[in-house]
């Protein structure tokens, strides 16, 4: 079999994932406003795809053409553009369908031509007092450099200023970072109707207010557009520059980086399209997409709660882990010292982790805190706790990953703020991004120093802990805490030899251990012993690991995969992957945790990890996976995995055709895994 048929291109697999998001917008069993929000998620995902994956592909094509080689990437580019165009057409149809459905529910998203006299007057007042101060037209002339001026992924109105036979052009930025994108209008009769208007259409209505008195014109016409830039940057090393200075300089490159996508309103005049293409230096490799009247649908992620309660998801209140609430424990450390604690977000509240770090910041027994941050919330209580700890005389070390994509600027800010507070801030070594989710608290207890560790699958982020599924293991088990200490030493001295007996740490031992564990399952299958591999991942694209899974399947090992995003492996290929089943689940929460399960001859090994099975995570990042040593907690993870694989509502097959076919229910009972997991965890968290 040809090698190209053994793997799905990761870019196409990623687009198939985003099409699963679009399926959620189309799913009539989802509440109406949630469906509208899924359109926003789809749009936001696609923006990131163009910034990162499409931009990388464009660079590969240019390099191959400069070298005179025949590029497979150019063929892939055509496939991508065809697939995106088809999905975008479906998106437009869905949006119009949802607008009609909203109208049936008395929610009206109207445009500037549908305003009543009363609403027109109200909007002019709104524009004058809340919006006008944020509007400054960019006039387009021979000297205008739009690549320098325009912001990445912002919506602009391109305005024709027509005077006789002369047409001039200007751009207006839609200031959705300063004013809400959705504006509630005064209701008309019948008063149960809830009219709203998009910020874009307020500007269209108020064009006269913007240009009158400055330009003579017979007519003004406005058309929407946006541009997406390449998100890559180069770290240009200078002898006297710190990593923070290099990152700050490199981020400025991103602000003026090459465009990779130009989206414009379908009825924009051809002459205006040509002017914008020329000014934005759009090349034949870039994506040029004629679209609808509105862009930046990512704002629809925050579509407001209007109308009846049944138009949004029924709330699932966060659950407390009742172990922390037992009266015998004076604080969180007492609870963790007695036994390991496993939290599973967003079903459990993230408050337990925030509270433990708050306690550590002032507890007289705490000597030191070490933590690594990758993406934190905008108003991070964790950062506040680290600053308070430093003020209280604790030895605080915060590892800040300055190269966390799209969070670089925020992390530079946090690093400066922490340093000013007296926190010891360290950064990753060049080319070795830190993606592990760790903290280590050292506490004086009698004559001993007892260490408490956190190993997680997700970021220390209060916001994403409400939306992403992730595990936190909290432990005082010295077998684990001693090795977490070694990980922090490795982070500070990445070129010193270090060994681990329990933890799986990239780039030190992850590939070797994963190969060994897969090979052991192969040997067990060949000897007739219990064998099997179950993986829950965001992405599975490392060819070495995919090939190892193919080998396991060929030896009779049953492999079950739950992959949310990219999956290069093709299940159910005859003679290659007959024993591999792969599904994906997209639902109200983003499936983010990584779990590795190996049958191990009947003595199952269960790992929780920060690492996906991508080459970068295995070989070029610091990642940590921990075994679950407590049998109770191991069973809990196994139970949750069983529920996920029993899903008959939101599970889709991953297949060669990228069909996103739903797993048929057959005669099985209806199981929506995320709701079932909530009920399962709720049943565990009952008072004694």
Curated annotation (Swiss-Prot):
Mg(2+) binds at residues 375, 405. GO terms for biological process: polyphosphate biosynthetic process. InterPro entries: PLipase_D/transphosphatidylase, PP_kinase, PP_kinase_C_1, PP_kinase_middle, PP_kinase_middle_dom_sf, PPK_C_dom2, PPK_N_dom, PPK_N_dom_sf. Belongs to the polyphosphate kinase 1 (PPK1) family. Residues 430-464 form the PLD phosphodiesterase domain. PROSITE patterns: PLD. This is Polyphosphate kinase. An intermediate of this reaction is the autophosphorylated ppk in which a phosphate is covalently linked to a histidine residue through a N-P bond. The keyword Mitochondrion does not apply. It comes from Salmonella typhimurium (strain LT2 / SGSC1412 / ATCC 700720). It catalyses: [phosphate](n) + ATP = [phosphate](n+1) + ADP. Its EC number is 2.7.4.1. Coiled coil: none annotated. The active site is at residue 435. SUPFAM superfamilies: Phospholipase D/nuclease, PHP14-like, PPK N-terminal domain-like. It comes from the Bacteria. Its cofactor is Mg(2+). PANTHER family: POLYPHOSPHATE KINASE. The keyword Metal-binding applies. Catalyzes the reversible transfer of the terminal phosphate of ATP to form a long-chain polyphosphate (polyP). GO terms for molecular function: ATP binding; metal ion binding; polyphosphate kinase activity. One of its GO terms (cellular component) is polyphosphate kinase complex. ATP binds at residues 45, 468, 564, 592. The gene is ppk. Pfam families: PP_kinase (PF02503), PP_kinase_C (PF13090), PP_kinase_C_1 (PF17941), PP_kinase_N (PF13089). Keywords: ATP-binding, Kinase, Magnesium, Metal-binding, Nucleotide-binding, Phosphoprotein, Transferase.
């Amino acid at each position: 079999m040809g090698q190209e048929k053994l793997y799905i291109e990761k870019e196409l697999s990623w687009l198939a994932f985003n099409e699963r998001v679009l399926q959620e917008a189309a799913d009539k069993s989802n509440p109406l406003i949630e469906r509208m929000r899924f359109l926003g998620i789809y749009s936001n995902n696609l923006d990131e795809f163009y910034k990162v994956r499409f931009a990388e592909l464009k660079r590969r094509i240019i390099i191959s053409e400069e070298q005179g080689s025949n590029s497979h990437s150019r063929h892939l580019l055509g496939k991508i553009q065809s697939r995106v165009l088809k999905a975008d057409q479906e998106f437009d149809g869905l949006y119009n369908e949802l607008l009609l459905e909203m109208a049936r529910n008395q929610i009206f998203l109207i445009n500037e031509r549908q305003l009543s006299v009363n609403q027109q007057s109200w909007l002019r007042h709104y524009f004058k007092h809340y919006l006008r101060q944020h509007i400054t037209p960019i006039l387009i002339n021979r000297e205008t450099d739009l690549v320098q001026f325009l912001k990445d992924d912002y919506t602009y109105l391109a305005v024709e200023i027509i005077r006789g036979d002369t047409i001039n052009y200007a751009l207006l930025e839609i200031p959705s970072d300063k004013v809400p994108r959705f504006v509630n209008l005064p209701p008309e009769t019948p008063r149960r109707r809830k009219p709203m208007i998009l910020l874009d259409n307020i500007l269209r209505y108020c064009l006269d207010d913007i240009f009158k008195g400055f330009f003579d014109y017979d007519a003004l016409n406005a058309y929407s557009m946006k541009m997406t830039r390449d998100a890559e940057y180069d770290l240009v090393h200078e002898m006297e520059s710190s990593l923070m200075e290099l990152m700050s300089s490199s981020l400025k490159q991103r602000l003026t980086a090459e465009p990779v996508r130009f989206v414009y309103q379908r009825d924009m005049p051809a002459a205006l399209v040509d002017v914008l293409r020329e000014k934005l230096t759009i090349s034949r490799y870039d994506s040029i997409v004629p679209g609808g009247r509105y862009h930046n649908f990512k704002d629809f992620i925050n579509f407001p709660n209007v109308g009846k309660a049944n138009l949004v998801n029924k709330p699932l209140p966060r659950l407390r882990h009742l172990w922390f609430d037992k009266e015998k424990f004076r604080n969180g450390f007492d609870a963790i010292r007695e036994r390991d604690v496993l939290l599973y977000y967003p079903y459990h509240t993230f408050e337990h982790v925030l509270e433990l770090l708050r306690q550590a910041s002032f507890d007289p027994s705490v000597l030191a805190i070490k933590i690594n941050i990758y993406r934190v919330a905008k108003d991070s209580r964790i950062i506040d706790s680290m600053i308070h700890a430093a003020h209280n005389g604790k030895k605080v070390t915060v590892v800040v990953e300055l190269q966390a994509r799209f969070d670089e600027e925020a992390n530079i800010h946090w690093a400066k703020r922490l340093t000013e507070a007296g926190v010891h801030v360290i950064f990753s070594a060049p080319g070795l991004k830190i993606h592990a989710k760790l903290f280590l608290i050292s506490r004086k207890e009698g004559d001993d120093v007892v260490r408490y560790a956190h190993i997680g699958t997700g970021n220390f982020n209060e916001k994403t802990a409400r939306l992403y599924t992730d595990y936190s293991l909290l432990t005082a088990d010295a077998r684990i805490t001693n090795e977490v200490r070694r990980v922090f030493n490795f982070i500070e001295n990445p070129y010193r030899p270090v060994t681990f007996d329990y933890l799986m740490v990239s780039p030190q031992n992850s590939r070797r251990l994963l190969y060994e564990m897969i090979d052991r399952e192969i040997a067990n299958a060949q000897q007739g012993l219990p064998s099997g591999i179950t993986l829950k991942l965001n992405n599975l694209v490392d060819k070495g690991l995919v090939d190892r899974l193919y080998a396991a399947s060929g030896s009779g090992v049953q492999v079950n995969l739950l992959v949310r995003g990219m999956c290069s492996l093709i299940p159910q290929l005859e003679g290659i992957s007959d024993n591999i089943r792969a599904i994906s689940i997209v639902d109200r929460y983003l499936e983010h945790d990584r779990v590795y399960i190996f049958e191990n001859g009947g003595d199952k090994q269960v790992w929780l990890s920060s690492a996906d099975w991508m080459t970068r995570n295995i070989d070029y990042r610091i990642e940590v996976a921990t075994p679950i040593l407590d049998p109770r907690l191991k069973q809990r993870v196994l139970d949750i995995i069983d529920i996920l694989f029993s899903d008959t509502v939101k599970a889709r097959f991953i297949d060669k055709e990228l069909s996103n076919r739903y797993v048929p229910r057959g005669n099985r009972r209806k199981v929506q895994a995320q709701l079932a997991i909530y009920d399962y965890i709720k049943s565990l968290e009952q008072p004694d």
